[in-house]
Amino acid sequence: MYFLSLPSLVIVIPVGYLLFHLGYNLFFHPLRGYPGPLLWRASSLPWKIALLRGTMHHDLMRFHQKYGDTVRIKPDEISYANAQAWRDIHAHVPGRPEFLKDPVRLPLAPNGVMSILVSDTKNHARFRSLFGHAFSDKGLRTQESTIVQYADLLVEVLREVADTGRSAEMVYYFNMAIFDSIGALSFGESFDSLKSRQLHPWVDAIHKNLKSVAISHVLRSMGIEFLTPYVLPKELRGKRQENYSYAVEKLNKRMKMEGDQGDFWDKVLVKSADDNQRGDGMSAGEMLNNAAVMVVAGSETTASALSGAMYLLCLSGKIEKATAEIRKSFASPEDIDLISVSHLPYLTAVIDETLRMYPAVPGQPPRVVPASGATVCGRFVPEETRVGVSHLATYFADYNFTHADKFIPERHLQKTEEPFKYDNYGAYQPWSVGLRNCIGRNLAYAEVRLTLAKLLWHFDFTLDVDKTGNFLDQKIWSIWAKRELYMFIKTRGTSSSSPQ
């Protein structure tokens, strides 16, 4: 009888197992009937590579264009690009278990404590209740002076680079302004980036930490997350702890302040101090993790929306129409406030269209189908399957939006008119839907509206096409890895400062 040698067995057994695994995923797996690229259906390796490279959501756009609104992108994961999926996956349905976020794709804090981003249904509701006042209309009115203060300070800083004939890098300035604002709203004090004309190092730590999070996600999916410190590139090592340390320092200072500061923590600290062990306040560890989440979510989303809006306005030529609406509506910049800018229809349409083409949070973790399975888009999906809606694939699909690849703010003002009356606006959910939709949506809209209004009232902007290139061609690690955005700035009423 012939027996394979030991060296041969070392090769044959793993190869045989691999072939069996690939064959099962393609021909016998419960999701075998879903379309998708062959290698992605057979193995999770292409998915891991795309996640590490930051190209996942651009790949999903290509796949949905080829295979339709439902695509299998991993042996156990399905991506959707339609309105029904938002409702089936994210909407709250009484009596139905929640589709929880995939734990493999969630960033874990060094202290292992939950935050509003990483929590079960019960604790998520507790966190939202505690932060509810800060993000309510009443809370926004309290925060308005802070938002106005940093928008005005941004205007003053941009005066230094206006009318020089040289283009200014706007992502840098938006990051400074919004990071200062969110610092004041999160911790009762600014990071003073605009005053120092220098970005706080926490911004760099945030961006590099997100890349390291992608690496840890891949290793966690393989059961070897403990190797993360050993495989991270040198420049990324320690960024997770550095990001955490900044939050510790700032929150400790905030907790020592007496009285209301007009920030996110006023009601939380009072409620937590008076908790009496009922469990409806926050522990110190929970406050810390939520503080870190608020800074990242509150600064990056708004800075991205501002950058995207300015680029798309200038590239499309729509900036003249937006500027005209603002200057016609306000005789003085002091007249610009949160209430008045909310009544500018075209500016609001500009923001909505920006978030369609350049969503503030392009990468969201998929949800996990609960026990016993569920029906998604008319088909039964077995439990433990990962399911999600791709923002970019959904918003750039021609079956959802007319001229989907074009920046047309008017589509949001003419929903019942040709050619936009057939657009599927239910598919447009930049802030998600359901119980876990973005709690900071109103604040983000307020900051973007007011900042754009202030800038377009004071200045004329022209895109420096040569230095900027295609601004939308960016990688994504949960948030955009933003390119530089160069613009010529001239003070309103002066001659053009851009080169002829």
Curated annotation (Swiss-Prot):
InterPro entries reported for this sequence: Cyt_P450, Cyt_P450_CS, Cyt_P450_E_grp-I, Cyt_P450_sf, Cytochrome_P450_monoxygenase
Topological relation to the membrane, as annotated: Single-pass membrane protein
Keywords on record: Glycoprotein, Heme, Iron, Membrane, Metal-binding, Monooxygenase, NADP, Oxidoreductase, Transmembrane, Transmembrane helix
Alphabetized GO MF terms: heme binding; iron ion binding; monooxygenase activity; oxidoreductase activity; versicolorin B desaturase activity
Recorded catalytic activity of this chain's protein: versicolorin B + NADPH + O2 + H(+) = versicolorin A + NADP(+) + 2 H2O
GO cellular component: membrane
Glycan-carrying positions: 243, 400
Spans traversing the lipid bilayer: 3-23
Cellular compartments annotated: Membrane
Record-linked Pfam families: p450
Pathway: Mycotoxin biosynthesis; aflatoxin biosynthesis
Cofactor: heme
Gene3D superfamilies per record: Cytochrome P450 (1.10.630.10)
GO biological process, one term: aflatoxin biosynthetic process
Keyword Iron: yes
Keyword NAD among UniProt keywords: no
Enzyme Commission code(s) on record: 1.14.19.n5
Domain of life: Eukaryota
Signal peptide per UniProt: none
Assigned protein family: Belongs to the cytochrome P450 family.
Function: Versicolorin B desaturase; part of the gene cluster that mediates the biosynthesis of aflatoxins, a group of polyketide-derived furanocoumarins, and part of the most toxic and carcinogenic compounds among the known mycotoxins. The four major aflatoxins produced by A.parasiticus are aflatoxin B1 (AFB1), aflatoxin B2 (AFB2), aflatoxin G1 (AFG1) and aflatoxin G2 (AFG2). Within the aflatoxin pathway, the versicolorin B desaturase aflL catalyzes the conversion of versicolorin B (VERB) to versicolorin A (VERA).
Protein name per UniProt: Versicolorin B desaturase
Organism: Aspergillus parasiticus (strain ATCC 56775 / NRRL 5862 / SRRC 143 / SU-1)
